[in-house]
Amino acid sequence: MKQGQVLLLALLFMFLTGCTTTPPKDQGNLCSIYREYPDWYEDSLQMQSEYGTPLHVAMAIMKQESSYVADALPPRDYLLWVIPWGRVSSAYGYAQAQDPVWGEYKDNTGNGGSRDSFDDAIMFIGWYTTGTQRQLGISKWDTYNQYLAYHEGRGGFSRNSYRSKPWLMQVAQKVQKQSEIYSAQLKQCRQELEDDRSGWF
């Protein structure tokens, strides 16, 4: 391979990897997250305005699902416990939305979007939690049950599938606690974020 081709490939690799947003440095602090990525705050506000899902609820769900990794994938599945055999599901991106429900979201909203784009992923979570409230009567502020329905699907939640998964109920409690922490943190820095936001325009 010629030296020029090697250089071109190296530059292309650097460009592609540079386009990926790295996860926030302090994922446990919502103020730190929004300070690091102020556009995420703006995207979260747009989601809340359109769907009414509280920022701290949507962000707690996203943290649990992907740890804010843009191209997050579920664990690999294995044949005979050793041979890699695809992934355990089609979940992908910030919101870990699976192919069928992502397709439903795009059809219902007209949003082409991408699962590895934060603004599209946060809007998806808002859309899904709104549908859960409408279909199952679960408040958008009820992080615990919203997360169970998000993880199991609304049909699975209706069948109480989570009750046979004590580990999942513990995870849902963890997400609930994280949302409470996020909510308290946001109250401390909301004015600062709004002041910074007003300076953008």
PLM feature segments, named:
Residues 84-88, 141-193:
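Catalytic and substrate-binding regions of cell-wall glycan-acting enzymes that process beta-1,4-linked
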Residues 1-7:
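Bacterial N-terminal signal peptides that target proteins for export
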Residues 191-201:
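Low-complexity, Gly/Ser/Thr/Pro-rich intrinsically disordered linker/tail segments
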Residues 94-145, 149-157, 175-176:
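Alpha-helical segment that forms one wall of the substrate-binding/catalytic cleft
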Residues 15-18:
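C-terminal motif of bacterial Sec signal peptides marking the signal peptidase cleavage site
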Residues 28-34, 44-51, 84-92, 107-119, ...:
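Second-shell loop/turn segments in exported
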Residues 20-79, 133-136, 186:
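Export/targeting segments at the very N-terminus of extracytoplasmic proteins
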Residues 72-104, 147-149, 167:
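Short, surface-exposed glycine/acidic/tryptophan-bearing loops
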